[in-house]
Amino acid sequence: MSFIFSKHAEEQLVRRSLERNVVNAVVLKPEQVVEDENDEDIAIYQSIVKEDDTLFLYRIFVNVKVQPNVIVTLYKTTKIGKYYES
């Protein structure tokens, strides 16, 4: 899958201190892909990643209706149970 980062996503990488290689890994091999309830063009790629002794859920919002796919926004959270579908 080919993808690019939107300007906003690039800004979020810096603002949230996210590592690009981790984001790339999640997009290329996500543990889950869920639909965005508000926008059918957006798929949310997510994976649980351990950093130091803390588990984070990386959530990458990707516009899958355009080529190349566009990473619209992204973040990581410790609220895994809220978003991760088991």
Language model regions located:
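Ribonuclease/tRNase effector modules and their secretory precursors
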Residues: 1-86
